[in-house]
Amino acid sequence: MDLHEDQRLIQLLDERHDWPCVYSFKFIVPAGKGDELKALLPEAEQVDARPSSGGKYTAYTFHCPMGSGREVLGVYARVHGIDGLLSL
């Protein structure tokens, strides 16, 4: 993403959320990548996991306290390097 796109996303997040709040991040990762994902989100107050019916993937929801839209984008930047990760 470029700087303009980041600023637009931060503005949208800030318009739709009253910070600080608990923000829900949703990801799908290949089975076996959950620990890597969890290690990058130590601030999560709650983590929900649901394996796919075939067992190849796991869907995760992380409930994390966030103080701003910029913090939210920082989390997405942190997890971006995980192979096979889908952000929802």
Question: Model regions: which residues?
Answer:
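Long, contiguous binding/interaction regions
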Residues: 1-59, 65-88
